[in-house]
Amino acid sequence: MEKEVIVKWKIKESETTKILTLLPELAEQTKKEAGNIYYSIYQSEDNPNELILHERYVDQQAQEAHRNSKHYQSIVVDQIAPYLEERTVYVVKKLI
């Protein structure tokens, strides 16, 4: 069963510019994953320090493979997570 994930990041204001430079590589590598169906990153128009990541994977195993991937660990865990004020993850299912 497909896994759809919505993630909200609130970045420390002083770090937003730095974090934005890391996103193209993260998106490029994630989209190359065998189990990735969709991956997109959005920035709030009201608060540029807030990002929404929309991800879809073929199944739970593909989602876990993403979280364990070298690029996720290197970019998200090592370079982005330390600068987040807030991180909320929603695993959702499509209703309509």
What residues fall within each predicted segment?
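Short hydrophobic/aromatic patches at helix-to-coil boundaries
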Residues: 92-96
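N-terminal first-folded block
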Residues: 3-31
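Residue-level preference for beta-strand/loop junctions
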Residues: 1-3, 33, 49, 83
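Short, well-ordered beta-strand segments in beta-rich or mixed alpha/beta enzyme
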Residues: 3-10, 40-67
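Short secondary-structure capping/turn segments at boundaries of alpha-helices and beta-strands
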Residues: 27, 38-41
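Short alpha-helical
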Residues: 14, 48, 71
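An amphipathic, aromatic/His-enriched active-site/gating alpha helix that lines ligand/cofactor pockets
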Residues: 34-37, 56-90
